[in-house]
From Swiss-Prot:
SUPFAM superfamilies: LDH C-terminal domain-like, NAD(P)-binding Rossmann-fold domains. Its EC number is 1.1.1.27. The gene is ldha. This is L-lactate dehydrogenase A chain. Homotetramer. The lineage of its organism: Eukaryota, Metazoa, Chordata, Craniata, Vertebrata.
Length: 331
């Protein structure tokens, strides 16, 4: 008899039970690992699968996480073969070429489209009913690419979008007002990145409109220069990349925030990238961030924002910028 047999008596033969809340992270780079640890520490899934083409790096990262299993409640698996991802509820795609210092997110695009042509069909093969969350940049265009390549309905393809931009915005407003970010209600919509749109008309604390107190807020004529906060949001990622070489922690926490809303069916509103054709005067088939409701079925509803004419114009300009790139893509 083995030690195990001497120690344990079987009462019944267990039937294999599939995972109920399996999450897959594709890509074990800085963003993938920050997303993985954030998901694990929030205890969101009963199984976390990780996949990457870099076999040694993947193996090392998975082992490193597995060595912390005592402190977690999640089974951790990893393989370069996508069969390891089978039957995932949510698949988070972070893989792709990394943004270089000074490189715009749009420059990355065709490099990452080619990577997606391999990744997306594999995800669909093993998790045909999953919710696909795209994090790789440029996120809005790659969410469109993932939607086209997957054949999924639009509610099951979501981009992490401006969830992080809005978090940065709320943090910086909070710093200026000496308040916690959760008490500063503010939204950034449109493109994740250089042409994002701050909705100054909606910024409020406890229902008090800040533009009501300072009608010039967010404009050139504002003596308090609130507009600089949006510039800081846009420049924030570039600044972090310049200082430490990449961004990871905040985007990882943002991803876990979105996964939580889906897995726990919270019906929480997030600014995430979705198909906005027909909204706010956008005519083309583009994905941009608008406040959207996330739950078990993915993205179930979109909130109709009341935008000022200038904000709507900026959103349309954002859409045109993205469409200009999208129509050149080879899918």
């Amino acid at each position: 008899m083995s030690t195990k047999e001497k120690l344990i008596s079987h009462v019944m033969k267990e039937e294999p039970v599939g995972s109920r809340n399996k999450v897959t992270v594709v890509g074990v780079g800085m963003v993938g690992m920050a997303s993985a640890i954030s998901i694990l520490l929030k205890d969101l899934c009963d199984e976390l699968a990780m996949v990457d083409v870099m076999e040694d790096k993947l193996k090392g990262e998975v082992m490193d996480l597995q060595h912390g299993s005592l402190f977690l409640k999640t089974k951790i698996v990893g393989d370069k073969d996508y069969s390891v991802t089978a039957n995932s509820k949510v698949v988070v795609v972070t893989a792709g070429a990394r943004q270089q210092e000074g490189e715009s997110r749009l420059n990355l695009v065709q490099r990452n489209v080619n990577i997606f042509k391999f990744i997306i069909p594999n995800i669909v093969k093993y998790s045909p009913n999953c919710i696909l969350m795209v994090v790789s940049n440029p996120v809005d265009i790659l969410t469109y690419v993932a939607w086209k390549l997957s054949g999924f309905p639009r509610n099951r393809v979501i981009g992490s979008g401006t969830n992080l931009d809005s978090a940065r915005f709320r943090h910086l407003i909070g710093e200026k007002l000496h308040l916690h970010p959760s008490s500063c209600h503010a939204w950034i919509v449109g493109e994740h990145g250089d042409s994002s749109v701050p909705v100054w008309s909606g910024v409020n604390v406890a229902g008090v409109s800040l533009q009501g107190l300072n009608p010039q807020m967010g404009t050139e004529g504002d003596g308090e220069n609130w507009k600089a906060i949006h510039k800081e949001v846009v420049d924030g990622a570039y600044e972090v990349i310049k200082l430490k070489g990449y961004t990871s922690w905040a985007i990882g926490m943002s991803v876990a925030d979105l996964v939580e809303s889906i897995i726990k069916n919270m019906h929480k509103v997030h600014p995430v990238s979705t198909l906005v054709q027909g909204m706010h005067g956008v005519k083309d088939e583009v994905f941009l961030s608008v406040p959207s409701v996330l739950g078990n079925s993915g993205l179930t509803d979109v909130i109709h924002m009341t935008l000022k004419a200038e904000e709507e114009k900026q959103l349309q300009k954002s859409a045109e910028t993205l469409w200009g790139v999208q129509k050149e893509l080879v899918l």
